[in-house]
Amino acid sequence: KAGSAERDLKIVIPESLSYDEVFNDIFSTYTSRHELIRVKTTNMGSLFKLTYQITLRDARKEKEFIDKLRERNGNLEITCARPGNGNVEI
C-alpha cells in the first residue's frame, strides 16, 4: 500500500498499565498490522519496555501516532524506527 511503512516500535510504560491491551485502539487507527514481540521489565520492575513490529497505515501520520502513544504512556520513552535501524542504543 502506498504510504504505509514498516517500523520497529519500542514503548516504555508504567507497570500499572495492562500492556496487552493498552494501545489497541491507537494501533487499530494508525496501523494495519502490529505484533508484540518482546516485553522486558526495567527500573526494578516498575516499568515495562514493549517491543512491537508494526506497519503504519500512513507514514505521514507517524508523529500524530507517536503523540497519541505519548499521551497514553505518560510521556515515557518511545522509539519508532525503520526495521534494523533503531535496535542499537547509544
Region spans (language model):
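Canonical alpha-helical transmembrane segment with a positive-inside/aromatic-interface signature
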Residues: 1-41
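Short, hydrophobic beta-strand segments
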Residues: 9, 47-54
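Conserved short beta-strand edge segments in small beta-sheet-based binding/regulatory domains
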Residues: 33-39, 66, 71-85
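Short proline/glycine- and acidic-rich turn/helix-capping motifs at secondary-structure junctions
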Residues: 40-48, 81-90
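Amphipathic alpha-helical interaction surfaces in cytosolic regulatory modules
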Residues: 60, 65, 69-70, 90
